[in-house]
A protein has these predicted regions:
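Sec/Tat signal peptide C-region and signal peptidase I cleavage site
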Residues: 19-23
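Bacterial N-terminal signal peptides
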Residues: 8-18
Length: 309
C-alpha cells in the first residue's frame, strides 16, 4: 500500500475498533410483546407477606437464642431466619441437587465446607455451598449467630455416612452410594465479606449465586428520589422474587400495595406476575440481595421504560 494512504488509515483504525467493541457490548434493542398477567393479581400466600421487618421477627423470639422462622416459601425456595446460640453447631449435611446460601445478620459462625479451609463468617457475610458438598457451621463468641438462609423448597438434607441424620417426620434415611458433586467457579465463591470487600474495598456486587436454578444478585446503588407511582419497574412470568436488605434503606413498589420502605434485615416479597420496583433510598448507599430462579430470567418492562429498574 502506498505510504500516503497509511497515515489516514492509522487515524481511522482506532475509531473502527471502538465502534466494533461498542457494537459487541451494546444492549440489544428491546422487543415488544403481549405478556400474560392474571386479571386478579397473584395472592400473598402464607407465610409470604409484602414486608417482614427484622425488628418484628427478633421481637417474636426475644429471650431465646435458638430458633427458626420461615419468612418465604415458594415453589422454588424456602427462606428462613435461623438463630444458633453460643456453642451451638449443626450436623454435617449436604443438599442433593441445589446450592444452599445465607446472609449473616449478626454474630459469628465457623463454617466448615469439605474441600475448603474453615473460615469465620461475621455480620454481613454471604456464604454458599454447592450441591452434594458436606458442610457444617458452629456459633463462635458470646452472642447468637443469626442468618437468613435460602435453600430449595421441599428438600430434606442428606448426611455423610459417618453422621447421624436428624429425624424428619414422614421420612426415613436409607444407606446409599452416589457420585458427582457441585463446585465453585468464577461467580460462585464460598463467601463474600460484604463489609470488607464491597463497602470498604470498593468491590462491585453482582451475582453471588448463579447456576441453572438460582440467581442471587447483590445490587448496590446510591439512594435516589422516589419515582412517580406510574413507574412500575418490571414483572416476571411464573415465579416470585424476594429480597433481603443488606445495607442502608430501600423503597419497593409492588403492584396493589402501598410504597414499602425497608431497612437492613427486612424481607420484601413480590408474587409472580406482579409489577415491582426496587430502588435505594435516602442519602447513602443501599444494597439488596435479590433472589430469583432460572437465570437469565425474563423481565417485562413498560414500553419506553429504562431497562434495569
Amino acid at each position: 500500500m502506498p505510504i500516503k494512504y497509511l497515515a489516514p488509515l492509522a487515524a481511522v483504525l482506532p475509531a473502527l475498533f471502538c465502534l466494533a467493541a461498542s457494537a459487541q457490548t451494546a444492549r440489544p434493542a428491546p422487543l415488544h410483546a403481549w405478556a400474560p398477567q392474571p386479571v386478579k393479581p397473584a395472592p400473598f400466600t402464607a407465610p409470604n407477606k409484602p414486608l417482614k421487618r427484622l425488628a418484628d421477627i427478633l421481637a417474636r423470639h426475644k429471650g431465646k437464642s435458638d430458633w427458626a422462622e420461615t419468612e418465604v416459601l415458594t415453589r422454588d425456595y424456602v427462606g428462613q431466619y435461623i438463630s444458633m446460640g453460643p456453642g451451638q453447631k449443626t450436623k454435617t449435611m449436604f443438599w442433593a441437587d441445589d446450592r444452599v446460601f445465607w446472609w449473616v445478620q449478626s454474630g459469628q459462625m465457623k463454617v466448615s465446607i469439605e474441600g475448603q479451609e474453615p473460615f469465620i463468617a461475621g455480620k454481613g457475610f454471604l456464604v454458599q455451598v454447592p450441591y452434594r458438598i458436606p458442610y457444617a457451621m458452629e456459633t463462635v463468641g458470646n452472642e447468637p449467630a443469626v442468618r437468613f438462609e435460602i435453600r430449595a423448597a421441599g428438600e430434606v438434607p442428606s448426611y455423610p455416612a459417618a453422621e447421624t441424620p436428624t429425624p424428619v417426620k414422614g421420612w426415613k434415611f436409607v444407606d446409599t452410594i452416589y457420585t458427582g458433586r457441585g463446585k465453585y467457579d468464577e461467580i460462585n465463591k464460598p463467601y463474600l465479606d460484604f463489609e470488607k470487600d464491597v463497602v470498604q474495598g470498593g468491590a462491585k456486587g453482582g451475582g453471588f449465586v448463579r447456576d441453572d436454578h438460582t440467581w442471587a444478585n447483590v445490587i448496590r446503588a446510591p439512594g435516589v428520589p422516589t419515582p412517580s407511582p406510574s413507574s412500575w419497574g418490571h414483572f416476571h412470568e411464573n415465579f416470585a422474587e424476594f429480597w433481603v436488605v443488606m445495607e442502608g434503606k430501600l423503597e419497593f413498589l409492588i403492584e396493589g400495595e402501598p410504597l414499602i420502605r425497608a431497612e437492613v434485615g427486612d424481607i420484601v416479597f413480590a408474587p409472580e406476575e406482579r409489577w415491582h420496583r426496587a430502588l435505594s433510598a435516602g442519602s447513602g448507599m443501599g444494597t439488596r440481595l435479590a433472589i430469583t430462579p432460572r437465570p437469565p430470567s425474563l423481565h417485562y418492562y413498560q414500553p419506553g421504560a429504562s431497562l434495569g429498574d
